[in-house]
Amino acid sequence: MVGAVTQIADRPTDPSPWSPRETELLAVTLRLLQEHGYDRLTVDAVAASARASKATVYRRWPSKAELVLAAFIEGIRQVAVPPNTGNLRDDLLRLGELICREVGQHASTIRAVLVEVSRNPALNDVLQHQFVDHRKALIQYILQQAVDRGEISSAAISDELWDLLPGYLIFRSIIPNRPPTQDTVQALVDDVILPSLTRSTG
């Protein structure tokens, strides 16, 4: 467990897998998503706005769902810098606030993409390896920093903790009329996560 945490903690973020031109296309896609929503987004509009051919877009992303998922993941990757406040509680609060802000901006897109993911195993693999694993690496980095500072023991870290903070906040963000608030983040950190990490392991 400790070895795995340390290995990823040394490299909390990965470089973009996309070329500069592909990154530009994904940025255009994300902008149009925010302006028009998933249902009204078309590959034609993305190609026109990015001054690219539809063939160029489809060659890299064969479906709208794949394009949108890639755009969302890349957008999150660019802003998901692990906080380093000097203490675990503040790091977790900062990360929770980041998740709420970014997921809240794209809640409708996430709902639409999750429907497509449920129908397409290939999309599910992308979601797992490029989104879920990256969120896990951020949490691992934060927890390993806390271990190094002596705030918690590595023995207190369990696999379930990787999903708890991002998983619950994303769930609340995509449920209509129940967005998480700063109080939600604080309660999750103070009442659930920190007690789990600081409990005696015998």
Curated annotation (Swiss-Prot):
Residues 1-20 are annotated as: Disordered. GO terms for molecular function: DNA-binding transcription factor activity; transcription cis-regulatory region binding. The keyword Transcription regulation applies. Keywords: DNA-binding, Repeat, Transcription, Transcription regulation. Pfam families: TetR_C_11, TetR_N. One of its GO terms (biological process) is regulation of DNA-templated transcription. The keyword Transport does not apply. It comes from the Bacteria. Residues 19-79 form the HTH tetR-type domain. This is Uncharacterized HTH-type transcriptional regulator Rv1556. It comes from Mycobacterium tuberculosis (strain ATCC 25618 / H37Rv).
